[in-house]
C-alpha cells in the first residue's frame, strides 16, 4: 500500500465529476494507493512467447496473461535477488518491462486490418521505447518506423532500448511532433501519438505524480495535444489509421481533444469503437467508442485510447518543407557492399536485409523504405550500425549481434551459465567447444550476449563497457 500517494482534494473532486456512474470513487482511491503489478512484454523479434515462458518457468517465473496483448504478462518471480532490469534475459532483449495499460495503444493500432506492417509508420512521441519496440515487433522489422522524441534527455534511453531489442527498421528523429504535418504530409500508413499529458493515471508508480496538478495546467496541455493531433492527421495517408493515447484521465486531454479534430475535419475521418478490442473491453469503453481505462477496472494504470481513420485528403495550411543540412551518409558502392555481405553470410549464415550506407569509418544498415523520407527529414539515427572499418577490414558491432545473432547458424559460441556470468562481467572466457578463428557471436541458451574474438582457445570479450555488470545476472 502506498499510503504516501499524493491525491489532492481538488483532483479528487474533479475526478468524481467525471467518474462513470457504475464505478466507485472509493475503489478508485484504493486502486491509486496500491502498488502496480509488475508486467512485461515478450520481444518476439528475439523469441516466441511459448519458448520464453518455457525457458523462464523453471526459474520460478509465473505468468498471468494481459488480455489485450498476446505478448504481455503480469509477472511474479520466486527469486528476486537479481533486479528484473539486470537479468541476462532483459539485457539480451528477450523482454521489455512495460506497464500493461501502455500495451493498449499499439494493440489498438494493429487490430485495424488497414495497417500495412511493411509500410511507413510513425511513433510521434516515442521515448523511452516501449511502444516503439512493440510496433517494430508487430512489423517484424519490415517497412520503416520513424520514432520521434522531442525531449533531448530521453533520446539516449530510446536508442538503447531500440538496440537492446534488436530493432533494425527504425529511424530516430528529434523534433516537436507538430513538424510532421508540415514537412511530411500524407506520408505515413499508420501513426501512434502517445501524447505528452498530465499523467493522472501514473500515481501507482509515482506517488508524487499529482504534486503540481491543476485544472489550468490540464487546459494548457490539451492545447498542445490538439496541435500534435492535427499535425498527425495531416501526416497520415488517406486510408490510414491514427491512434491517440494518454496516461491520463481528464476528458479535456482525451475525449475533448479527439472531438475537436472530428469536428474540424468532418467526414474526412471517423472514430472506431474499441469495445471489441479484447474480452471485457466494453467495461472501459465510452458510448462514443473510446477506451477510458480507470485503474480499478483492470487493476492497472489509468489510460485512454482512441482510434481514428482518415478517409480523404483535406487542405493542409500547415505544409512547409523543413530546412535540412547535408546528409552525412553515402550509399556503399556495390563493389564494397556485396563482398562484405557475402563474407557475413559465409561466417554466420545470415544476410542482413536493407541498404548499406557509409559515414567516415562506419557502415550502417538502413531500412529498405528509407528512400521515401530521404531528403525530407533529418535523422539522429537510422537502422543499425553494422560495422566499423579499419585498414585491414572491418569489425561487426554489438548491435549487429543483438539484431542478428539469434538467427546465425554458424560462427557461434554457446556458453554455459558459469562462462555466461563471466562474459557479462566483462571477462574473457574459455569455452569447452573447439576453438575457431576471428570474430564470433557469443550466446547463452540460444540467445545473443554479444560479440567475441578467438585468441587461441580463449574468447576475448567485446561487450561494450556500459553493459558490463559486476554482479550475478542469472539468479540462483
Swiss-Prot record:
Q: Which residues bind S-adenosyl-L-methionine?
A: 125-131, 149, 176, 194
Question: InterPro entries of this UniProt entry?
Answer: Methyltr_RsmF_N, MeTrfase_RsmB-F_NOP2_cat, MeTrfase_RsmB-F_NOP2_dom, Nol1_Nop2_Fmu_2, Nop2p, RCMT, rRNA_ssu_MeTfrase_F, RsmB/NOL1/NOP2-like_CS
EC main group? transferase
Catalytic residues per the record?
A: 247
* Listed GO MF terms: RNA binding; rRNA (cytosine-C5-)-methyltransferase activity
Gene Ontology CC annotations of this record: cytoplasm
Give the EC number(s) under which this enzyme is classified. 2.1.1.178
Per the record, the GO terms for biological process are: rRNA base methylation
Q: Does the keyword rRNA processing apply?
A: yes
The highest taxon in the source lineage is: Bacteria
Does this entry carry the keyword Cytoplasm? yes
Kindly state which reaction or reactions the protein catalyses.
cytidine(1407) in 16S rRNA + S-adenosyl-L-methionine = 5-methylcytidine(1407) in 16S rRNA + S-adenosyl-L-homocysteine + H(+)
The protein's location, in the record's own words, is: Cytoplasm
Q: What parts of the sequence cross the membrane?
A: none
> Keywords of this protein's UniProt record, alphabetized?
Cytoplasm, Methyltransferase, RNA-binding, rRNA processing, S-adenosyl-L-methionine, Transferase
Record's family? Answer: Belongs to the class I-like SAM-binding methyltransferase superfamily. RsmB/NOP family.
Q: What does this protein do?
A: Specifically methylates the cytosine at position 1407 (m5C1407) of 16S rRNA.
Would you tell me the protein name for this molecule?
A: Ribosomal RNA small subunit methyltransferase F
